[in-house]
UniProtKB/Swiss-Prot annotation:
<keyword id="KW-0677">Repeat</keyword>
<feature type="domain" description="ABC transporter 1">
    <location>
        <begin position="320"/>
        <end position="599"/>
    </location>
</feature>
<dbReference type="GO" id="GO:0003677">
    <property type="term" value="F:DNA binding"/>
</dbReference>
<keyword id="KW-0547">Nucleotide-binding</keyword>
<dbReference type="InterPro" id="IPR027417">
    <property type="entry name" value="P-loop_NTPase"/>
</dbReference>
<feature type="zinc finger region" description="C4-type">
    <location>
        <begin position="752"/>
        <end position="778"/>
    </location>
</feature>
<comment type="subunit">
    <text>Forms a heterotetramer with UvrB during the search for lesions.</text>
</comment>
<comment type="function">
    <text>The UvrABC repair system catalyzes the recognition and processing of DNA lesions. UvrA is an ATPase and a DNA-binding protein. A damage recognition complex composed of 2 UvrA and 2 UvrB subunits scans DNA for abnormalities. When the presence of a lesion has been verified by UvrB, the UvrA molecules dissociate.</text>
</comment>
<comment type="similarity">
    <text>Belongs to the ABC transporter superfamily. UvrA family.</text>
</comment>
<dbReference type="GO" id="GO:0008270">
    <property type="term" value="F:zinc ion binding"/>
</dbReference>
<keyword id="KW-0238">DNA-binding</keyword>
<dbReference type="GO" id="GO:0009381">
    <property type="term" value="F:excinuclease ABC activity"/>
</dbReference>
<dbReference type="GO" id="GO:0005737">
    <property type="term" value="C:cytoplasm"/>
</dbReference>
<dbReference type="Pfam" id="PF17760">
    <property type="entry name" value="UvrA_inter"/>
</dbReference>
<keyword id="KW-0742">SOS response</keyword>
<dbReference type="GO" id="GO:0006289">
    <property type="term" value="P:nucleotide-excision repair"/>
</dbReference>
<dbReference type="InterPro" id="IPR003439">
    <property type="entry name" value="ABC_transporter-like_ATP-bd"/>
</dbReference>
Amino acid sequence: MNEEYIKVRGAKEHNLKNINVDIPRNKFVVITGLSGSGKSSLAFDTIYAEGQRRYVESLSSYARQFLHLQNKPNVESISGLSPAIAIDQKTTSKNPRSTVGTITEIYDYLRLLYARVGIPYSPVTGLPIHSQTVAEMVDIINELPKGTKVYLLAPIVRGHKGEFRREIINLKKQGFQKLIVNGEVCEIDDLPKLDKNKKHNIEVIVDRIVLDENLGNRLADSLESSLNLADGITYLEIVELPQAVKSQFKKNQRITFSEKYSCPVSGFHLTEIEPRIFSFNSPFGACPKCEGIGKEFFFDRDLIVQDQRISIKDGAIVPWGSTSSKFILETLKALADHYKFSIEVPFISLSQNVKDILFEGSGEEEIKFEFHDGSKTQIIKQPFAGIIPSLQEKDRTIESVLIKEELAKFKSEHKCTACSGFRLKDEALCVKIANLHIGEVAGMSIAALQKWFSHLEEKLNQKQLFIAKRILKEINERLKFLMNVGLDYLTLSREAGTLSGGESQRIRLASQIGSGLSGVLYVLDEPSIGLHQRDNTRLIATLKRLRDLGNTVLVVEHDEETMYEADHIIDIGPGAGIHGGRVIAEGNAEKIKHFEESITGRYLSGRQTIKVPSETRVGHDNRAIELLGAVSNNLDNVDIKIPLGTFTAITGVSGSGKSSLMIHTLYKAALKHLEPTSKVFPGKYRELKGLEYIDKIIDINQSPIGRTPRSNPATYTGAFTHIRDWFVELPESKARGYKVGRFSFNVKGGRCEACQGDGLIKIEMHFLPDVYVKCDICNGHRYNRETLEIKYKGKSIADILMMTVEDAMQFFDKIPLIYEKLITLNEVGLGYIKIGQSATTLSGGEAQRVKLAKELSRRSTGKTLYILDEPTTGLHIDDIKKLLKVLHKLVDMGNTVLVIEHNLDVIKTADYIIDVGPEGGDKGGKIVVCGTPADIAACKESHTGRYLKQYLV
């Protein structure tokens, strides 16, 4: 293909205003602009979608039936288009079997490496295990002194129950005369009857030999016969040694030989060492107990009794309710009488012994139970089974899916006790390279793994090195790519479902570089998300390398450093939604600076900035929340103090422990304290102080606000409740007798029943993601014809749901209840989204800001602690300015705002900063420095401080 440009003509997808743009091929191109300006509409919904559609159309009709054919984007023409690959943030696998190792294929190479050069060790003795040929066995036997009398034994039964009549009859037919049964030599004709309920060991005496030089082939032939009888294993038993000869061997000593892999002492053996035994997704390798998941689920005492402050009688034992069942109440009363405790006191005041009996049962101790049924009284003496064994029995025997789901609420997740969380069978975990099994290697961080592999060649012998050379090359290259995109702190065993969108995207980016493709159009969505400024340079170098392979790299991005390094920038705007959709500026960063209409250009040139506050807040009378001794994940016994009434930023390189500290420990521990029934499990810590100063803790994260098309910003913020109430009060509604439910799309009455108020019909694609198509009965309007006849200012309720937040604000400007809900959405920079936009189409950043808007619209107590994890995701610097205004407004109302953030424009406005590090993974988990932005900038050990310094000038 010789075209110099990808030429887009007449693009009108979503809010794009018939734009024409030439994108230079084989270059690193950034598309930027405000959130909602149309960047993704151009990059993903137009250019990538058309590239994908053309590819699918080129396939046979048979192949096309398995693929979702995209609709043609609303564009007149696109020429110069290459095969397109999208690397976005929405395709993270939630399958617990998908890990960093499997996604990057490093684990596949590891399996091959262990299968080819790994050495098996007996888990019993720790001795190395080798397979042997018959010739090798003969050589070992010939090392015994001449004149030694030996038996060659075929172990046909090893520790199994049974009478084994059929096996003995078969041996008789083959001409064998003597057996060793449970250590005793027996004639096959005089064999005593075996107890079928006891375990037995039976060995066939295949040959009795006195070793000398004239044996010829007898030894080899006998060995082959013995190996055939016992599935590749044979024993050599030394019966008698020559008296005159001193030897290392002893009388009655047994030597184990195996054509397979067998331990000479314990008898532990492997049938094969192939890549499949190292796969936790294969029945040949997966741990039989957890089936390769690495986790088990047990009934948890803390979930069974969620609030120890209430009594058993009042419902402390959650699965048994408030003991409303007469049978349960009488059982517990009998138990209380027997062990002398009360069911009317708080559960926490019961002795540990009583708690243990309640949970695990009374063992063999019998309790007198009296059950009253009307006029009858039944007395039973029996042990008490215990809450947990009772729940286990119910879980095992019940077939109802609903009851099983209900029981699952009382279980917590733990490492598998059989495989210690390594997911594999013992046979796989006994194979080692440089004293480490594959599970231990997969559990190392990428940085540690790279270091281990760099020294591995020194630990391999010549034969191993020759076999492993190509495998090691592939592994080292992939590790280098992961290092280059700032993921050195991840482990290969990390589940894909636990990765952030940015991490997942960068893993797939590293995989693409490893594939070495050229002539491809790569479309990326903010790859810098979640990346510390220190690692950004390496990411940009990776993107350039992708370009240098002969590819076009098209990146939707807001990061200034990325823009300065790009070959070409396309600025979409000037505003968001209907105010965007035009190409405002094109060229490199220096050219963009001079376009007056470009908001991006104004910030690049410094004409517009986010100012550093003239002073920082010190908080409420030195009140603070103190978390002491946090040790979750990589945290190293961390102590922190968060001043209340401040805007506090948690900083540090990726993987340093910020989320472990703030989300997994502080947030969950505080929530458990404030709401004891909440199903959260905080990371380990010693003490949490200062919670008496707050009444709420809210994690405003990027999880979806809903999982169906019925969820939308209007319903989530509560604006839709007021809109429905307003429509009910309209004269036409009153005349028809319509109630509030008429305008709900969640209940029958006014909604379209064909789509049940979704506006879309879900088509299940079985092994592909479900597809939603517009309902052809209501044409996507959600309501039936009669409901749509009710109008306010000429607009039906469906028309209102199609309005943007800005339009709806103007429409309802005289109705305070609705207007106040909508204005908060506008304040967080979401004026461009439709109030009825499906929750499933909102980005993580948009969902987070909808949640923030909901919090803003609530009456503030001034005692709330808000936690936000990377709230700048997906935001242009001008949107960040609006967001900061909102967050500081929350603090001015007396609340405390805690943000985990890498964006230096946010960090510089903080009152207080806690910098975690100094590195990621095992080299992180410590507090590097705490204080004001100036304090952080002055700290030489802080990576954040080094970059923050230039922002404080």
